[in-house]
């Protein structure tokens, strides 16, 4: 009997091998971006203080225009798309049209509405607390945590539904890191978890959520300790975790950032977002973005550490 991963890989490669080869050429030979983030919608029902709220509101492209945009990116050799917002599930029909055009996809969602199985797509669910009280407080929406549990349980009960939890630690919730890992590693609703720390954003009104240097150092220490307890569920290598330390981030700048260099970001009107997904309003010297720790963790380390980080990145993607 064939391994299930092998049976998934064969049709995936038959469908996508030309664009995968073109993407490798873009990155390795031409030094061009090979992935992009796209704001599927410019709307969100959640009341948190995320980077999106500090950006200008725009007129969304039509479904047909977005599909055309993604098809063009595929022809150019882009191999990964991050489907974000706002809240991407504000436009569920559009998600169904664009997911799978690009070989690898993340849908980053707050889980406010029922979730759909999408081809070649991992759902990245935003969870900022181990309890409804904490999560709903951070997210500014009462009852949201209970809705996430309901929607994830329903989606997972229908069969294969690749899911990664994403937690952004801030001054209000960082002390609950261990509880979040304990809860989500045992409830059967996710395949892993990724951790970011809050990146300060101008005009986001996030002052009460910003981490002190001491808190950021403590988070790195806690993550290194917890990695031994959750070696598979915590989708971060030691190299990635150490990239969150203030001694490392204080040297970051857009010209040296692999996220800014290799991953383009677009708003819901199809216009480039300056710098990166967080925009040029982000304070790079306190960057805690998981995408940056992933890309940064593949360089400047031993061969073993680089391969481990690459394998961790692949765990967050799906061929199915």
Predicted feature residues:
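Conserved alpha-helical substructure of the radical SAM core
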Residues: 2-117, 313-317
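Residue-level signal for mature regions of secreted extracellular proteins and peptides
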Residues: 37, 41-44, 250, 277-280
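Glycine-centered loop/turn positions within well-structured domains
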Residues: 46, 132-133, 282
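Alpha-helix termination/capping residues and helix-transition junctions
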Residues: 75, 117, 186-187, 281
């Amino acid at each position: 009997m064939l391994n299930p991963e092998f049976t998934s890989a064969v049709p995936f490669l038959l469908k996508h091998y030309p664009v995968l080869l073109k993407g490798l050429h873009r990155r390795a030979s031409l030094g061009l971006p090979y992935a992009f983030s796209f704001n599927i919608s410019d709307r969100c029902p959640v009341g948190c203080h995320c980077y999106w709220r500090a950006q200008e509101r725009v007129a969304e492209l039509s479904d047909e225009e977005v599909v055309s945009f993604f098809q063009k990116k595929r022809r150019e050799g882009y191999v990964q798309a991050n489907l974000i917002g706002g809240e991407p599930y504000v436009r569920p029909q559009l998600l169904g049209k664009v997911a799978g055009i690009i070989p690898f996809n993340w849908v980053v969602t707050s889980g406010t509405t029922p979730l759909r199985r999408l081809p070649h797509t991992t759902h990245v669910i935003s969870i900022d607390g181990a309890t409804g009280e904490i999560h709903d407080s951070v997210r500014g929406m009462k009852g949201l945590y209970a809705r996430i549990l309901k929607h994830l349980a329903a989606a997972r009960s229908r069969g294969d539904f690749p899911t990664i939890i994403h937690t952004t630690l801030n001054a209000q919730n960082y002390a609950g890191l261990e509880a979040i890992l304990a809860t989500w590693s045992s409830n059967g609703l996710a395949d892993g978890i990724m951790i970011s720390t809050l990146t300060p954003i101008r005009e986001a009104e996030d002052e009460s959520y910003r981490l002190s240097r001491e808190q950021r150092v403590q988070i790195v220490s806690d993550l290194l300790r917890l990695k031994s307890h959750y070696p598979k569920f915590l989708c971060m290598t030691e190299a990635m975790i150490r990239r969150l330390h203030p001694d490392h981030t204080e040297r970051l700048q857009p010209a040296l950032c692999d996220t800014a260099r290799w991953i383009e970001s677009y708003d819901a009107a199809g216009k480039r977002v300056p710098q990166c997904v967080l925009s040029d309003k982000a304070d790079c010297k306190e960057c805690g973005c998981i995408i940056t720790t992933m890309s940064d963790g593949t360089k400047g380390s031993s061969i073993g550490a680089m391969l481990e980080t690459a394998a961790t990145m692949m765990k967050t993607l799906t061929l199915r």
